[in-house]
Amino acid sequence: MLASTFSYRMYKTALILAALLGSGQAQQVGTSQAEVHPSMTWQSCTAGGSCTTNNGKVVIDANWRWVHKVGDYTNCYTGNTWDTTICPDDATCASNCALEGANYESTYGVTASGNSLRLNFVTTSQQKNIGSRLYMMKDDSTYEMFKLLNQEFTFDVDVSNLPCGLNGALYFVAMDADGGMSKYPTNKAGAKYGTGYCDSQCPRDLKFINGQANVEGWQPSSNDANAGTGNHGSCCAEMDIWEANSISTAFTPHPCDTPGQVMCTGDACGGTYSSDRYGGTCDPDGCDFNSFRQGNKTFYGPGMTVDTKSKFTVVTQFITDDGTSSGTLKEIKRFYVQNGKVIPNSESTWTGVSGNSITTEYCTAQKSLFQDQNVFEKHGGLEGMGAALAQGMVLVMSLWDDHSANMLWLDSNYPTTASSTTPGVARGTCDISSGVPADVEANHPDAYVVYSNIKVGPIGSTFNSGGSNPGGGTTTTTTTQPTTTTTTAGNPGGTGVAQHYGQCGGIGWTGPTTCASPYTCQKLNDYYSQCL
C-alpha cells in the first residue's frame, strides 16, 4: 500500500511539473516524412454472434523512430548514444529534438492488409532495423482502448517462422489513449507518433517519457547497438495475451499498484532494467501459464497438438465473479482453434498445481512449487489485473529478441544453472546456448510473425465452439454503413445440442442447453455455463 501511495504521489508531481514547463520545452514533431498509419481492421462482436468490422490503424512506437534536431537533419541519437551537445539534459533535449514520420514497409518491415499485420524481424534499408512494436489506433491521434472484463479476445497467428530466441508478442498495456499528450503538454507528438509506452518491466530504455527525453544518466547497452538505459522508466499494468515463437508460448497477467502509466526513477523502477528486480511498484514476473513449463511437453510446437507449422486461432476469456463487466476478474481461460477443431488449453501436470487456466489458486500453488517470489499477489493479483482491464488498455503487437536473457525464460531452461528436472525450470526445447541476439539476427533475418482476424466480444461470441471453422464460422453481409461490415457467427450449439466447450446456459441465453455426449453443462457463473 505504501508503494502504491508513493507511486501515485510521484505521478501527480510529474503532472504538475510537466504543466509548469510549458510548450517552450517540448517533445517535437518532424516534417521530413509524413506519418501515414497502415490500416488494419478488427471486429467487435455481440452475444448473439453478430460482429461489426472496425477500420483501425496501427502506429509504430516512438523508440523506433528517427530523432533529429529541429530544423535540420542532425541526429539527436545515433546507435545507442545521445548527442550531448543537442541533448545536455532531459528538458533541453525534448525542446531541441523531433520524432520523424515512418516509412513502415521499407524501413521497419511492417505490412498491413485487411485484418492482417505482418512484422518482419530484420529489415535493411539505409540502416538495419531489428523488430518492431506497434499499437492499434482508433483514429490517427488516439489509441483504441479495449475493456476486456467479461469479454473474450480472439486472434489468428502464424508463428511458423519464429525460431528459438524470438518473441512474437501480442499484449495489452495501460497506456494513455492519447499517448500522454493531454497530461504532459511538452509531448507534442502523442499517439500519432507512438508515444506513451509503459509496461510491467518499467522500461528505462525509452528515449522519451512524459514529454521529456531520458538522456540524463543514459548508459549505452554493452550488447545492443541500438539501446541503452536512462534514469527514468515508464510503469503500467500489462496483460500478456501471447508471448510465443514456434517452440513455446505463455500468457501472463502483470498487475501494478497503480494500473495506469507512472514514471519511475533508477533502480526503484524494478524490472529487467534495474539491479533490484522486485524493487518497483509492478510485477515483472507475472503469473504465467506455459504448457511446457506446466509439464505438458507435447502440447505446443511443430507437429504437436497445437501445430505451430500452420496458422491457428487463440482465444482468451476474462471471466468475472458475477458475469458482468463490472465484476472482479477471477479467471483467465485459454482455448485454441486449428483445422476446425477447438483445443482446450493443456492441464498442468504438476502435483499440487492443477488446472488449465489462471486463477488465484493456480498462481499461489505454482509460485510455491516453483519457489518463485509471489510478487503477483503483492501487487494485486488478478484483482489488480482486472482494475487495469476495467479502465481500458492499448493493444500491442510486436516482434523482438532479448538482449537481457536470450529469451531462455520462454523457450529453454531458465535459470540456466538449475537442473531441467527442477519444477518450473524447463520452459521449452531450445538449447541454453540459443537466443543470443547477434546469432538470431545473423542466422534468421527472414523471420516474421503474422497477426490477423482480431475479434472482441462477450464470452462465446468470437469463435465457433462447435468447431467448423477456425476463423469463427461466420457468414458476411455488408451493411449500408461505408466503414463497417456485419458478420453473424454460426450457431455454436449446432442443431439444438451444444458441442464441447460451447455455451449451454446462463441468464439471457436462448441457445441449446443440452451438451453433446459425454459432456455436461457446468455453471461458471450466473451468466455463462459451458459444456465440459
Curated annotation (Swiss-Prot):
GO cellular component, one term: extracellular region
EC supergroup of this enzyme: hydrolase
Expression induction or repression: Expressed at high levels in the presence of carboxymethylcellulose and repressed in the presence of glucose.
Ranges of biased composition (kind: Low complexity): 475-490
Glycosylated sites: N296
Span of the signal peptide: 1-26
Listed name of the protein: Probable 1,4-beta-D-glucan cellobiohydrolase B
Organism lineage: Eukaryota, Fungi, Dikarya, Ascomycota, Pezizomycotina
Gene for this chain: cbhB
